[in-house]
Amino acid sequence: MNRTLVMTAAACLVATAASAQTPAPDAAPPFVLATYYRCDYSKQTRADTLYKQVIAPLLDKQIKAGHLTAYGFSSHRMGGVFRRLESWTAPTLAHLIAAQDAYEAELAKVNPKAGAEFDAICGSHDDYIWNRTLGSPTNAAAPTPAYSYSRYMGCNLSKEGEADMIMETAFAPIMNKHLAAGHITAWGYFI
């Protein structure tokens, strides 16, 4: 199983186009669907336009329906083969699945051509579902950041509990010091 540490300038999974609502303070850790796209480099800006004009409004509907609490679409900066990252955040796995089902049905109804065009540009992807288990409080009022950073760690399955404990006792205090100093505005640890 992989663990991931996400440090951002303003939100836990940050994107160039993001929307969020503040979860209740006692809410369970959120689930995040992350889709990592391989896109045609020469057409990726068209994919960005399609996302902003067609996909984002449909995801806004999923926030209004209470299925999602946030979503984002990030561009590639360095490393790896993925050109774009889409993230959806939901309070439960059931909400995440409901959002996906409703979104896909709505896109097929209102603009299937745009969906097909986006898929042709970003035709290959990997999907992951993460559960945020540790991190700073979210700040839905924070402005969309210009940059975020993520680190993926492959853990020995028999020692994941130890890795989680090290993250909580060694890394979390360091991240919280950076948060308090204003170097970052949020961070999260997902499993």
Task: Give residue spans per PLM region.
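Positively charged n-region of N-terminal signal peptides that target proteins for export
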Residues: M1-T4, Q21
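Short S/T/G/P-rich N-terminal loop/turn motif that feeds into the first structured element of a domain
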Residues: A20-I191
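Bacterial N-terminal signal peptides
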Residues: M7-T16
